[in-house]
Amino acid sequence: LMKLDFLAPEALAPRLRLHKVISPEKDKLETLYNLLCTLGYHSTLVFCNYRESVERVVGYLKARKFPCDMFHGGMEQPDRERALYKFRNGSCHVLISTDLAARGLDIPEVGHIIHYHLPVNEEAFTHRNGRTARWDATGTSYLILHAEEKLPSYIPEEMETVALPENPPRPPKSLWATIYIGKGKKEKL
């Protein structure tokens, strides 16, 4: 029996790195803020389990003057499309979302995935992480955990713990802005 293997050994190396971040508080907002500041302005998707949580996280980050946008099923379609467009074109580097963004969106070069809430099942974990490390790219997935939270069996226990600096500097504003010009009611400019 002959076996053909066209993949070079280095191609088999994992392209997705898993890390955990321990939050000293059950409310993980400050830990998320520090992690986002530490990561800088790299394309980052933050997953929450509920629409209300998405809105709460976005409100907190915007109050801290951290630019971000949200994406969930309770939003009007034009608002969702606008948020995705800004995320894709780089004028918004951080998108806070429910699992609605975990499937079917082809967003190239997402560098980081942050699980603000633990995914509800293995399928959600797989699809969330599938937004990064696509094709030949690498990516990093972070799980923010409170000390009392236990990892579900489908998430590997062996992962590096990332220690965050006390007060990381907020990254500078994006160099890009998105300008929307509507066509009006009669679709004329």
Cite the ranges covered by each PLM segment:
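Non-catalytic terminal extensions of ATP-dependent helicases
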Residues: 63, 167-189
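Conserved segment of the helicase C-terminal RecA-like domain
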Residues: 94, 121, 129-167
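A short helix-turn-beta junction within AAA+ P-loop NTPase domains corresponding to the substrate/partner-engaging
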Residues: 1-7
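A short beta-strand element within the Helicase C-terminal
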Residues: 103-118, 140-144
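Conserved interdomain hinge at the start of the Helicase C-terminal
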Residues: 12-63
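Conserved nucleotide-binding/hydrolysis micro-motifs of P-loop NTPases
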Residues: 9-11, 25-28, 51-54, 75-77, ...
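Conserved helicase ATPase core of P-loop NTP-dependent helicases/translocases
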Residues: 54-60, 65-102
